[in-house]
Amino acid sequence: YLLETLARGRDGLVVWGAGPIGKAFAREVQVQGGSVRAFVDLDPRKIDQRIHGAPVIHPSGIDEYRDGFSVAAVGQEGARRQIRAELESAGWEEVTDFVAVA
């Protein structure tokens, strides 16, 4: 549904969260024919790694993926609020440019 509606016409997805939820979400996106351009995470051990072929970046690098659609896939309490604040401060609009799925 997400690929056919909100993310339609965008250059792939940017998944916030390189943990179990984000990885599972990305696998399903790929099964459905979508592409994940990058993962965004705060964990320095994950940054610069690759997951399912996509790089893991720090939130400060999000502007490079402005043409993608961001999806917050983090289950940690408070993460959704933090991700929303980060994206909105960078000029992204909820629903138009990003949604939370976890």
Predicted regions and their residues:
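Hydrophobic, well-ordered beta-alpha structural blocks that scaffold small-molecule cofactor pockets
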Residues: 1-102
